[in-house]
Amino acid sequence: MHSNKVKEISLIGILAAVNIASRIYLQFLPNIKPVTSIIIISVMLFGLGFGVKLSVVTTVVSNLFLGMGTWTFFQILAWVVICLITQFLMDFLKKIGKEPKLFPMAIFSFFMGYVFGIVVSLEQLMLGGPSLYIVYYMAGLLFDTFHAVGNFCFYLICAPILIKVFKKESERMKLKQD
């Protein structure tokens, strides 16, 4: 196996373990976990494919402990959508010659909490149509706000540490897509 592939799998394993542990051990805090922020940071450092793989591993393994159901697909979908939006933003910033800054990216991470809720709630649209979707989403809006605020705070905490630790590795591995 190519050494970069081994490094990629190892990094996904490490970050997934952090995400999984946080989902399990912080479950008493409603929607306040570092998972979305770590996924955003992973896309920034290692690219879209890495972020998608991290999202799938995090969701499937943590849901083996927390409960597996139809929502698992929509959780994966939500984090993949966040990966796509993050990659689009990174490509745009690169095109205009800008580097992502801490506070604006924390604000971006905040809004991704609402994106997550909108996408996860799509299950209700399929089950009960637009009326159920709207009611379900509105009922969960407080939890999406917890998610958003948690993302903002966790991004401010995690980004400086993870970027410092993994930036050199991402350049060495050349996982990031150009």
Q: Residue locations for each model-derived region?
A:
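Membrane-embedded alpha-helical hairpins and interfacial helices in multi-pass inner-membrane proteins
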Residues: 68-73, 98-178
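Hydrophobic transmembrane alpha-helices
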Residues: 1-41, 45, 49, 53
